[in-house]
């Protein structure tokens, strides 16, 4: 699936350039209309100078008034917003043409499935569940107010018109560009989690009413063509969210915030369901005179009418001979009652409202069965099946919320509870990990409460326990689909998982004796050490009878989350990717040994440095046997609009992920290569990873690197941009890489065009393999190993985005002389990495194999470079003012933040 890093058009480039030029001309007219011709002249002058004479450009910008500088940045940024949306529209057009000529990706996947074992294919389809999980950080740098207007511009661009309508269309485009210019793209205040939730809900609402139904309808048809029926109760596509549930490092996410976000989601989810049911009511005019109905339908209708006095006598009279329409009216009333119940906080009343999506689906199934048995099969298995599958995909909650908390928070709360009991000879905090694991496993089997309610714990402990109580309350009020997974970040051992399980038991979420586990406990492995210990952690869990029982109660499925960001930040991209690949193999082997199905949750970022890149390729590059029909993948805030703003691209992205998961699960069940080849490649990757890791650690362990990083990038401005509700640094961390979260780490390098996390160390790794005389193995890996080819492709694309010519300007202007040796190290590794990657690909220049993407980057640079020059000039001014102890200039800060937004738009990502 395309991400912010790769979603570039491959359509006819001349048509694309013509449309970009058309919008660029309209933007020029907007600038003249709004600000006068002088601004347009200055924009063109700056663009020319940055290409021809960098020093003259820098000199000009150093003396530019702040207000003019801000307008300049806004002009270039607006150009990028318009160029981006034009590329998306053309990509959508191209996909439509390809679909018409060759069929969609699901059709091509269905053709491949004819080679699959029929029984295994049926099992895969039964278990099929692809879940994109929306996260908030780093939040889309463009505000929703801007995105709404860009969406309108996209719709106008995609409207086929004849010459007589062209003038009117251009007027509408110009109006919207004027509105974009007059809209403040900077957030005035940092968004609350509820604001972030509204941003995700905006996209989920659109998906609900469009792309998802198309994908599910196509999937059903293509599977039937491949000889497999998609079972009625299978949910092949669902959605998840972390917004409102991710409290790791975000003090703003309290139990109350979680509750408020769930209420907000349900308001939208129920409204979307009402819209679909209203549409159904319009269709279901089947008369009892011409089409019969089952006894089940008539009995359920009678029961509904008795319990729902709100149904108007008029409806009962008008629809007396239309039982299907009257049943749809009852379903609608139950949805309205559910909405009112949630708003008022009153208890669920069976038969009057819905407790979860399953009850809604059950009502619709009664209608579907009756239609099938009374000559209405075409509609039952067509439009109605589409409605049912779409409602099952989103549920009344729109997206299932994951809850995430740091492992230490659970131990902090449990320590107080165990120490209060005084049963152990040492304090909980002093216990070795192995001892603590046994203690917690024993406690999980026990039925006693650890503490009275409310528990005698401090404020942080109370907050942690409150989260579990909120989860329990949510399941009671909203139904079982609202929260399914509790994720433990920085999970280093089995005791971290047991700790969360014991607290869940305390809250009544798990009872092994009564035979229920209402949530699953999910370890998040996010550092290189944790990834290396993946099999040991899972083995320690599944070997324990109490935990194995918990997994059995969750359908014999164990979810494990793999974190790409932190492993890359601390180990470098090569070691991160390789250790994640190996961890998946080891997790697969342990899970299979215990008869457990593994659900991997990939915590991938939007950028290559945080695990990003095309999702479709990444899924197909997974080790054999690791996919068994289920996968979860994070959709980071900053790539959501790239993937889902344009309906055609939303459909394509979902189709790509579903198709890849289906293909990998059904066909990649055994090694594609011989054991000898795999052993040879593994040994080669060990050489590459070790050398790359050494080079990367040499860079990050340079004592001057933290200061160089802050000097050569605008990372200190990240907090002021109000991108998201989560702080960019860990509390009390100061100037250190350990204290900086992975997102601002990537953000800073990206803004200064160095993009170190996306490629650093790769050249040293590949060189080490060549020097070991393994050139032929390298070629073999690139030609035959999907994992390695995907890795090299992502690195090559990041190298093409990296621009050390621009980075040199940052360093020359902003970095003290005594720190410039760090940039020399970066330049040397960059030169080596480009050379080594070209050796592997056989190209003479980066992206020779993708000339359209290469050309796109070249065109973008002409508009991106001026923003970078402006950013350097403004950073210099701000730092000089700070050194002189002058009061911060709000206009300067604003202009600087506009450059940050502009570079993000130009490179199509924040972090």
From Swiss-Prot:
GO cellular component terms given for this protein: cytosol
Keywords: Carbon dioxide fixation, Lyase, Magnesium
Pfam families registered for this protein in UniProt: PEPcase
Cited Gene3D superfamilies: Phosphoenolpyruvate/pyruvate domain
Cofactor(s) the protein needs: Mg(2+)
Catalytic residue list: 137, 569
Biological process (GO), any one: oxaloacetate metabolic process
Catalytic reactions on record: oxaloacetate + phosphate = phosphoenolpyruvate + hydrogencarbonate
Entry's EC annotation: 4.1.1.31
SUPFAM superfamilies noted in UniProt: Phosphoenolpyruvate/pyruvate domain (SSF51621)
Signal peptide: none
Source species, domain of life: Bacteria
Function: Forms oxaloacetate, a four-carbon dicarboxylic acid source for the tricarboxylic acid cycle.
This protein's name: Phosphoenolpyruvate carboxylase
Primary gene name: ppc
């Amino acid at each position: 699936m395309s991400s912010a890093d790769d979603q570039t058009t491959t359509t006819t480039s001349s048509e694309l350039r013509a449309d970009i030029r058309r919008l660029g001309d309209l933007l020029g007219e907007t600038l003249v209309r709004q600000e006068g011709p002088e601004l347009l002249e200055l924009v063109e002058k700056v663009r020319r100078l940055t290409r021809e004479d960098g020093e003259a450009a820098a000199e000009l910008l150093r003396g530019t008034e702040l207000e003019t500088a801000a307008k300049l940045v806004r002009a270039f940024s607006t150009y990028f917003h318009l160029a981006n949306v034009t590329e998306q529209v053309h990509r959508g057009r191209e996909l439509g043409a390809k679909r018409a000529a060759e069929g969609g990706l699901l059709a091509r996947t269905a053709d491949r499935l004819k080679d699959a074992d029929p029984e295994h294919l049926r099992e895969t389809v039964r278990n099929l569940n692809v879940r994109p999980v929306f996260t908030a950080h780093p939040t889309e740098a463009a505000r929703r107010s801007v995105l709404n207007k860009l969406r309108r511009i996209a719709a106008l661009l995609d409207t086929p018109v004849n010459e007589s309508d062209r003038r009117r269309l251009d007027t509408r485009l110009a109006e919207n560009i004027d509105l974009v210019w007059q809209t403040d793209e900077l957030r005035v205040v940092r968004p609350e989690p509820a604001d972030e939730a509204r941003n995700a809900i905006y996209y989920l609402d659109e998906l609900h009413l469009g792309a998802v139904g198309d994908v599910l309808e196509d999937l059903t048809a293509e599977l039937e063509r491949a000889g497999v029926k998609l079972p009625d109760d299978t949910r092949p596509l669902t959605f998840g969210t972390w917004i409102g549930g991710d409290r790791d490092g975000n003090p703003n996410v309290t139990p109350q915030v979680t509750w408020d976000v769930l209420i907000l989601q349900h308001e939208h989810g129920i409204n979307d369901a009402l819209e679909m049911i209203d549409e159904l009511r319009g269709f279901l005019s089947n008369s009892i005179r011409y089409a019969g109905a089952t006894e089940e339908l008539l009995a359920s209708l009678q029961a509904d009418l008795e319990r729902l006095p709100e149904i108007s006598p008029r409806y009962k009279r008008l629809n007396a001979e239309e039982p299907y329409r009257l049943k749809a009216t009852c379903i609608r009333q139950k949805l309205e009652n559910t909405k009112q119940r949630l708003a008022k906080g009153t208890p669920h009343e069976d038969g009057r409202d819905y407790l979860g999506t399953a009850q809604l689906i059950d009502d619709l199934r009664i209608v579907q069965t009756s239609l099938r048995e009374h000559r209405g099969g075409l509609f039952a298995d067509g439009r109605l099946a589409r409605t049912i599958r779409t409602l099952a995909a989103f549920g009344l909650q729109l997206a299932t919320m994951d809850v995430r908390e740091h492992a230490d928070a659970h131990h902090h709360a449990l320590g107080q509870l165990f120490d209060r009991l005084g049963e152990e000879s040492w304090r909980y905090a002093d216990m070795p990990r192995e001892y603590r694991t046994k203690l917690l496993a024993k406690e999980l089997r026990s039925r006693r409460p650890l503490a009275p309610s409310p528990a005698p714990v401090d404020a942080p402990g109370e907050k942690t326990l409150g989260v579990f109580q909120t989860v329990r309350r949510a399941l009671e009020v909203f139904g079982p689909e609202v929260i399914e997974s509790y994720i433990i970040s920085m999970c280093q051992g089995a005791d971290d998982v047991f700790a969360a399980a014991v607290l869940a038991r305390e809250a009544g979420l798990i009872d092994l004796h009564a035979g229920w586990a209402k949530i699953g406990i999910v370890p998040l492995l996010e550092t290189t050490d944790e990834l290396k210990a993946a099999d040991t952690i899972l083995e320690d869990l599944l070997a324990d009878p109490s935990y194995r029982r918990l997994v059995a109660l969750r359908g014999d499925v164990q979810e494990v989350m793999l974190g790409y960001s932190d492993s890359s930040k601390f180990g470098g991209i090569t070691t991160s990717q390789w250790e994640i690949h190996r961890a998946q193999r080891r997790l697969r082997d342990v899970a299979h040994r215990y008869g457990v199905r593994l659900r991997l949750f990939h915590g991938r970022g939007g950028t290559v440095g945080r695990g990003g890149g095309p999702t479709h390729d990444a899924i197909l590059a997974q080790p054999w046997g690791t996919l068994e029909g289920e996968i979860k993948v994070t959709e980071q805030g900053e790539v959501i609009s790239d993937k889902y703003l344009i309906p055609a691209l939303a459909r394509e992205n979902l189709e790509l992920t579903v198709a890849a998961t289906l293909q990998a699960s059904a066909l990649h069940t055994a090694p594609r290569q011989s054991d000898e080849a795999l052993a040879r490649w593994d040994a080669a990757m060990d050489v590459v990873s070790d050398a790359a890791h050494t080079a990367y650690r040499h860079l990050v362990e340079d004592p001057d690197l933290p200061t160089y990083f802050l000097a050569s990038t605008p990372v200190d401005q990240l907090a002021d941009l109000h991108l998201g509700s989560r702080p960019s640094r860990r509390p009390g961390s100061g100037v250190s890489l350990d204290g900086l979260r992975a997102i601002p780490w990537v953000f800073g390098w990206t803004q200064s065009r160095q993009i170190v996390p996306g490629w650093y160390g790769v050249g040293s790794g590949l060189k080490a393999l060549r020097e070991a005389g393994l050139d032929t193995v390298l070629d073999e890996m690139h030609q035959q190993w999907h994992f390695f080819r995907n890795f090299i492709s992502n690195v090559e694309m990041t190298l093409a985005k990296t621009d050390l010519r621009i980075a040199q300007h940052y360093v020359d202007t902003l970095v003290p002389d005594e720190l410039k040796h760090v940039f020399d190290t970066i330049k040397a590794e960059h030169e080596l990495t480009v050379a080594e990657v070209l050796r592997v690909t056989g190209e003479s220049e980066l992206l020779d194999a993708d000339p359209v993407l290469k050309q796109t980057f070249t065109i973008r640079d002409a508009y991106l470079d001026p923003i970078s020059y402006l950013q350097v000039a403004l950073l210099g001014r701000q730092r000089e003012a700070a050194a002189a102890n002058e009061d911060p200039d709000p206009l300067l800060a604003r202009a600087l933040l506009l450059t940050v937004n502009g570079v993000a738009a130009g490179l199509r990502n924040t972090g």
